[in-house]
């Protein structure tokens, strides 16, 4: 079940109305960080949810979905895989809408073109074909901030008209480059297909997603977000001049845009911006036991923030409920509760030393 820590974090933030009763929607990538939380919110709102996963019989990876409130009556698991053409047909048929979140995530891939990029594009088009066959109302796609601002020189502000520079990404090959390429090409292919097939398609562009979570393992985005605590230096570049959104705000923006008849096109869903120094300062104040660094090599302390404009989304009536501190404290507490983060840097080093001694 959803932990009391999570419930306390969310109390009184987003109002939940039973507007989805009688409506069936499909969520791809259901067992993941965003998918599982979105399903929780959809169930609370009265929707019947078809959740696609690669292996519905893998209890370890799906039990957190089955334990959600209202899951017994309003949630079913469906086997589907981005690598298998037509595998989403059955899950989508009979739905009024689809939330497409599933995406391959393997930053260590030895063959990113065939293991991440092509499956993301082909999987996107295959799902849209299923949607056209089913004659459903609307598709909401979870894109990425990496489709917007990855280029040689950062602008002060980015909006939905911006696209990242593919040639730059492929040449530099920074951390996560294959994910950025896959999301850019998949979204661009989706816009073309949707226009040609008169399919109502909306993309949501989240920056780094931070917050509490239901899934049992560490979400990839939190590996990045919490890198100042864990000293994962290869991820520092992503939060050097970062943008952030709370997981709950992001999921509620998905539902908001699905339900709003005026919604169309791309929408950035970013609550705030911060530099790695802003994050480090906040973490030192909230969690001094982690001894978060005060200096970061190659990064100037006075570098400016880079903003993602969510004006299009807020002008439509959406309101962000959480700030940076809310996101990070909820993420840290969830990680601690699941044993995914040490209680202090000293504890982490002790475990590390014991491990070294054991393996000598």
Swiss-Prot record:
Reaction catalysed by this enzyme: a (2R,3S,4S)-leucoanthocyanidin + NADP(+) = a (2R,3R)-dihydroflavonol + NADPH + H(+); (2S)-flavan-4-ol + NADP(+) = (2S)-flavanone + NADPH + H(+)
UniProt family annotation: Belongs to the NAD(P)-dependent epimerase/dehydratase family. Dihydroflavonol-4-reductase subfamily.
Pathway: Pigment biosynthesis; anthocyanin biosynthesis
GO biological process terms on file: anthocyanin-containing compound biosynthetic process
Designated gene of the protein: A
Pfam family, one: Epimerase
Protein purpose: Bifunctional enzyme involved in flavonoid metabolism.
SUPFAM superfamilies found in the cross-reference section: NAD(P)-binding Rossmann-fold domains
Keyword tRNA-binding: no
Name of the molecule in the record: Dihydroflavonol 4-reductase
Keywords of this entry: Flavonoid biosynthesis, NADP, Oxidoreductase
Record: residues binding NADP(+): 61, 179
EC number, UniProt record: 1.1.1.219, 1.1.1.234
InterPro entries (UniProt xref): Epimerase_deHydtase, NAD(P)-bd_dom_sf, NAD(P)_dehydrat-like
Enzyme class: oxidoreductase
GO molecular function terms noted in the UniProt entry: dihydrokaempferol 4-reductase activity; flavanone 4-reductase activity
């Amino acid at each position: 079940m959803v932990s009391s820590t999570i419930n306390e974090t969310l109390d009184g933030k987003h109002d939940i109305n039973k507007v989805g009763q009688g409506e069936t929607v499909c969520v791809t990538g259901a067992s993941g960080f965003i998918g599982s939380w979105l399903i929780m919110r959809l169930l609370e709102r009265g929707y019947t949810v078809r959740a696609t996963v690669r292996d519905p019989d893998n209890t370890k990876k799906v039990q957190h979905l089955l334990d959600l409130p209202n899951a017994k009556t309003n949630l079913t698991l469906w086997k589907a895989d981005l690598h298998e053409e037509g595998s989403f047909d059955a899950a989508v048929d009979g739905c009024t809408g689809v939330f497409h979140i599933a995406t391959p995530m393997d930053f260590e891939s030895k063959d990113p073109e065939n293991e991440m990029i092509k499956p993301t594009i082909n999987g996107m088009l295959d799902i849209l074909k299923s949607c056209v066959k089913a004659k459903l109302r609307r598709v909401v796609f979870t894109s990425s901030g990496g489709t917007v601002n990855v280029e040689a020189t950062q602008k002060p502000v980015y909006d939905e008209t911006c696209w990242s520079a593919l040639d730059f990404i492929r040449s530099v090959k920074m951390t996560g480059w294959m994910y950025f390429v896959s999301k850019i090409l998949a979204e661009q292919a989706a816009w073309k297909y949707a226009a040609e097939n008169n399919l109502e398609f909306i993309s949501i562009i989240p920056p780094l997603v931070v917050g509490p979570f239901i899934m049992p393992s560490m979400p990839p985005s939190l590996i990045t977000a919490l890198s100042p605590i864990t000293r994962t230096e290869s991820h520092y570049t992503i939060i050097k001049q970062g943008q952030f959104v709370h997981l709950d705000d992001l999921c509620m923006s998905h539902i908001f845009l699905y339900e709003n008849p005026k919604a169309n096109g791309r929408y950035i869903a970013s609550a705030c911006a911060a530099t790695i120094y802003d994050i480090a300062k906040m973490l030192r104040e909230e969690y001094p036991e982690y001894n978060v660094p005060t200096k970061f090599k190659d990064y100037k302390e006075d570098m400016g923030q880079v903003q993602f404009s969510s004006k299009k989304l807020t002008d439509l009536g959406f309101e962000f409920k959480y700030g940076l501190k809310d996101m990070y404290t909820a993420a840290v507490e969830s990680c601690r509760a699941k044993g995914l983060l040490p209680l202090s840097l000293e504890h982490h080093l002790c475990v590390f030393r014991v491990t070294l001694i054991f393996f000598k």
